[in-house]
A protein has these predicted regions:
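Juxtamembrane intracellular "pre-TM" segments in multi-pass secondary transporters
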Residues: 1-30, 213-223
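Helix-to-loop junctions at the C-terminal end of transmembrane segments
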Residues: 74-87, 171-172
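A single, central transmembrane helix in multi-pass transporters
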Residues: 16-75
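Structural signature of the two symmetry-related core transmembrane helices
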Residues: 89-104, 182-185
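Intrinsic disorder in cytosolic terminal tails and internal cytosolic loops
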Residues: 197-224
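Helix-loop junctions at membrane interfaces in 12-TM secondary transporters
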Residues: 106-118
């Protein structure tokens, strides 16, 4: 079998695993895409343009560093205290906290409040980041993990530049402030989807039976 047919088959299998075998896995994948696209647009375009227009481009580094430190601290805290709350509780708190942080950043406030928004976003993102990563590994059958993760990484690499390009068009046509508000609106939609999605209502349930998943994967391979 040639390289190209094998690659196409792996891509098709990866897509089926990510989007058709398990509700939690599907929602986790879609949320990951949404988060990468919106945050990539904020960090890669909106905030740099805002600080450059303000005449203080060097302040961007402090905002992004604050966000990263908050994410690191909350990830460590989640690892230590995760058993004290249900996964659903951590998930809901994280999504609401991230929405608050994005809303603060999207308002493009004075610098101290910008740092506050970055800190809130970073601290809130830790549990969600850990949970989404866990669901990806826990719900993907081992036999197709390489195909699924490879497909996800490929799609993410394509999604982020597309989102930044679309945001650049918005910034050019509407201005930085309006583009930031649009991104906040997109994040609100992501948060609403994350909270009401059927697959994310019982996050403490066990993963589906691996044998059933392997059967679905075998069917996907035969179809490809």
């Amino acid at each position: 079998r040639g390289v190209v047919p094998s690659a196409v088959g792996a891509l098709r299998t990866g897509i089926r695993v990510l989007f058709r075998t398990d509700g939690v896995l599907t929602v986790s994948t879609l949320l990951t895409f949404g988060i990468v696209m919106v945050m990539g647009s904020f960090q890669g375009l909106v905030l740099p343009v805002f600080f450059t227009d303000s005449g203080r481009p060097e302040l961007l580094g402090y905002v992004l560093s604050t966000m990263s430190l908050g994410l690191l601290a909350s990830s460590l805290a989640y690892a230590a205290f995760a058993p004290r709350l249900s996964r659903r509780t951590w998930y809901v708190l994280s999504m609401f906290g991230m929405l608050l942080g994005v809303a603060i950043l999207g308002a493009l406030p004075p610098y101290p409040f910008m740092l506050l928004g970055a800190l809130v976003l970073g601290v809130s993102a830790g549990p969600a980041s850990a949970l989404l990563g866990f669901f990806m590994l826990d719900r993907i059958p081992e036999a197709s993990r390489g195909s699924a993760l490879g497909t996800q990484n490929s799609l993410l690499l394509a999604a982020a530049p597309v989102a930044v390009f679309a945001t650049s068009v918005g910034v050019s046509a509407l201005g930085t402030s309006v583009a930031a508000i649009v991104l906040v609106g997109c994040w609100m939609a992501i948060t609403a989807f994350a909270l009401v999605a059927r697959g994310m209502r019982n996050l403490d349930d066990a993963a589906p039976d691996p044998k059933r998943e392997e059967g679905a994967l075998e069917e996907a391979r035969l179809d490809s």
